[in-house]
Amino acid sequence: MDNITSRPDPTAAFPNPNLPRLCFIKNVVKNPRIIIGDYTYYDDVDGADQFEKHVTHFYDFIGDKLIIGKFCAIAKGVEFVMNGANHRMDGVTAYPFYIMGGDWGSAIAPVKDELPLKGDTVVGNDVWIGQNVTVMPGVHIGDGAIIGANSVVASDIPPYAVAAGNPCRVIRKRFDDDFIDYLLAIKWWDWDIEKIEANFEALSSGDLSLIRKIKV
């Protein structure tokens, strides 16, 4: 596109004043362990700025992070379940007596190293996550992946896969392996915004030959 005179401000909470249901997540979250790339948005008619409430069981003493790349589209109701949701499972019961307080507060509480922690949850760049998806602790979703609505993502999803279901499984690849490798190499999401704007057609049309014509 030529002669662009206005573009969404990557530092704005709500980049389109006519679309208050959509926010750039990076500019509304407060927790420093939620790390979001530029232009990644959350779409929720009931309060897009409430994204952080959908990151659950996110406790400081565990220290895990939620990391989401650039240019991701996250639909209403997506929930990221973090490692604090996991109970110790090597005893007879997984019931956490100690959290009830009172005299039960002296029951054996697990230390961090005894919990089944899965590490940081990482979503790549250019990922589309459909409505009401649940992402479980420690999952890695690759660049360019698409996750179908109402899925429960409990294991890693490779780049440029279309995945859905409970548990979420890969349905198909979006492109052949050679083209996926090419896209992962050029990392279009890291281009400067002027270059992205100049190549909207190559990025968004169904003509995959156009992207290979761009000097990278």
Where are these regions (language model features)?
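Outer-envelope exported proteins of Gram-negative bacteria
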Residues: Y39, G69-F71, G144, G148-N150
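C-terminal segments of enzyme domains that contribute to small-molecule binding surfaces
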Residues: D2-R7, A13, Y98, G105-V135, ...
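Short clusters of hydrophobic/aromatic residues that line enzyme substrate/ligand-binding pockets
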Residues: V29, V92, L208-I211
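Extended, small-residue-rich solenoid/repeat segments and analogous flexible loops
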Residues: M1-R33, F97
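Beta-rich strand-turn-strand
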Residues: T121, N132-A145, S151-A154
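Flexible, glycine/small-residue-enriched loop-and-beta-strand segment within the central core
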Residues: F24, I34, Y41-V135
